[in-house]
From Swiss-Prot:
InterPro entries: Aldolase_TIM, Thiazole_synthase_ThiG, ThiG. The lineage of its organism: Bacteria, Pseudomonadati, Pseudomonadota, Gammaproteobacteria, Alteromonadales. It comes from Shewanella woodyi (strain ATCC 51908 / MS32). This is Thiazole synthase. It is found in: Cytoplasm. Its main location: cytoplasm.
């Protein structure tokens, strides 16, 4: 069981809502993935009605909705979006995303830390999307973030865990859940993140852009479960040289 703030999750696979061909496919894929936490960009909402074509189905699906601040370019804009989410969706949970560069969508560490500090002071449950920077993760933890969400590689790139050496450090040091977010493009990559000891992964593009999103959601669910089980079982140590798997009895010397 994964606990973030006061909420418990059975599934350690979190999903997104973008890039699906239809809301029907999206909902079916989410069900197939067994995900219990789904993130959605506030910029997709019609501010006049407080809705879009996927919000109502999501609210009725039983998943926990995690609004995000995608599109915010600085702390001020992100805080505004978080306050809007609390008013419209009646939630104090927010996925904090600040990426001023629209080409590479790299998260701004300075603005993210500033926004996180203020939002935590206002009582939000803040889950910041950030570079895989162990120092920044520690600072975000210190200001009160409920979890940290370091990237595996650029958003939507499907490049996998390009930041693995830094993810290992973050996981080792963290006192809050570590959710690997962005760039996970295959179930094997999600499995690897869980083997490292990540508490959860967030996957969107790899599922939504699949030829069969429903089946792919199921594949990711199985991969995350297997990776977590492998981590708990304890992986064998990696060696640079061969190690005998059978005892040396010397029986050949007796011939």
């Amino acid at each position: 069981m994964l606990k973030i703030a006061e909420h418990e999750f059975h599934s350690r696979l979190f999903t997104g809502t973008g890039k699906f061909s239809s809301s029907k496919t999206m909902l079916a894929a989410i069900r197939g993935s067994e995900s219990e936490l789904v993130t959605m960009a506030m910029k997709r909402l019609d501010l006049k009605t407080g809705s879009d074509d996927i919000l109502s189905p999501l609210l009725h699906s039983g998943v926990k909705l995690l609004p995000n601040t995608a599109g915010a370019r600085n702390a001020k804009e992100a805080i505004f979006v978080a306050e809007l989410a609390r008013e419209v969706l009646n939630t104090n949970w927010i996925k904090l995303e600040i990426h001023p560069d629209p080409k590479y969508l790299m998260p701004d560490p300075i603005e993210t830390l500033e926004a996180a500090r203020e939002l935590c002071e206002k009582g939000y449950v803040v889950l910041p999307y950030i570079h895989a920077d162990p120092v920044l993760c520690r600072r975000l933890e210190e200001v009160g973030c409920a979890a940290v969400m370091p990237l595996g590689s650029p958003i939507g790139s499907n490049q996998g865990l390009a930041t693995e050496p830094f993810l290992k450090i973050i996981i080792e040091q963290a006192n809050v859940p570590v959710i690997v977010d962005a760039g996970i493009g295959a179930p094997s990559q999600a499995l690897r993140a869980m083997e490292l000891g990540a508490d959860a992964v967030l996957v969107n593009t790899a599922i939504a852009s699949s030829a069969d999103p429903i089946a792919m959601g199921q594949c990711f669910a199985q991969a995350v479960q297997t990776g977590r089980a492998a981590y708990l079982a304890g992986l064998g140590q990696v060696s640079q040289q061969a190690i005998n798997t059978s005892p040396l009895t010397g029986f050949l010397n007796d011939q």
